[in-house]
C-alpha cells in the first residue's frame, strides 16, 4: 500500500512539473514577433521577400514536417541555426520554451 502511495505521489509530482515546464504560447507569440516573424511570416508561412532575397526555402512552421519535430529539435534549430538560418542567441530559457509552444499553435 505504501508503494502505491509513493507511485501515485511521484506521478502527480512529475505531471505537475511537466505542465510547469511547458512553454506559454501567448508569451511565445511575443518572442516569435520579435525574433522569427521577419523570415517566417506572421503565421509561420515564409516571407516571400526573404525567400527571394536569400534564395532559400523556408518550411511552413505549421506543416507536418515541422510539427512532427520534437521540442528539443526545434530548440536546437533556434539556438544553433540550420542552413542559412542563423542561430537566435537572444531566445533562451523560458523564452525558448514559449516560442516552441507558440509554434505548436501554428499546426495546420
Please describe what each predicted stretch is.
Residues 23-56, 80-89, 105-108:
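Periplasmic/extracellular electron-transfer cofactor-ligation site
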Residues 53-107:
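Extracytoplasmic electron-transfer domains, predominantly the class I c-type cytochrome c fold
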Residues 1-24, 73, 77, 102-108:
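Post-cleavage N-terminal segment of exported redox proteins
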Residues 3-5, 27-30, 47, 62-65, ...:
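Serine/threonine-rich low-complexity intrinsically disordered regions
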